[in-house]
Amino acid sequence: MDIPILFRDARFVVLDKPAGLPVHPGPRGGASVEDIFPSLSRRRDGPWLAHRLDADTAGCLVVALRRAALHEAQAAFAAGKAEKTYWAVVEGGPDADAGTIDAPLLKVSDRAGWRMRVDARGQPAVTAWRVRGRGAGIAWLELRPRTGRTHQVRAHCAALGCPLLGDPVYGAGQGRLHLLARAIRLPLAPPVAAEAPVPAHMRAALAACLSPAATTGGT
């Protein structure tokens, strides 16, 4: 398995995780990001996932190459200092061009499975967003989550009235999930920063949202 590397130093690697690949094996096994760990480092104290992405989310994934680096990264995430940027294509689109969603999220389960729901009893969750472009029945959003809840971007977009294109849990679920972990920055010494290119399955939808930069992976 070959996963592109977006950033590397002695402490960290930032991978360009492909959509559809889980970060670790499920109960039934199968391929995962962890399969390439031996090729990243042979140290006894690493590598480690510094955070997680949903299997169907593409883009920046930070891997710590040693335990001390893992603790640094975890502290940055816990303190809300990690700067994360997501690109998403959503169904419809918000009326405004920018805003902030401040809506706590609670995990709920039923016979169909589990999901996150906006609920006052949930954990605090805040996501800033802006519209980068609009197309016919879709919109391209840039989102900056200020907290790190499970499914936060997906659940917040649904709460905004515009679920992600291809989201089987919070939207219609037709086609592939259009969500990219576009960029990440950890303000460490030295900093860790990377930007992921647009995956092939998102290019047409982003181009339809009127931005020529979308098809080349530019900003």
Predicted regions and their residues:
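Loop/turn elements at beta-strand to alpha-helix junctions within RNA-recognition modules
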Residues: 67, 146-147
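Thr-Gly-centered strand-to-loop micro-motif
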Residues: 24, 141, 165-167
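Surface-exposed loop and edge beta-strand positions of immunoglobulin-like domains
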Residues: 51, 144-146
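RNA pseudouridine synthases
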Residues: 1-126, 133-135, 178, 183, ...
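Phosphate/ribose-recognition catalytic cores of enzymes acting on nucleotide-derived substrates
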Residues: 157-197, 219
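Short histidine-centered loop motifs in beta-beta connectors
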Residues: 136-144
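Short beta-strand segments enriched for Tyr within beta-sheet-rich domains
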Residues: 149-157
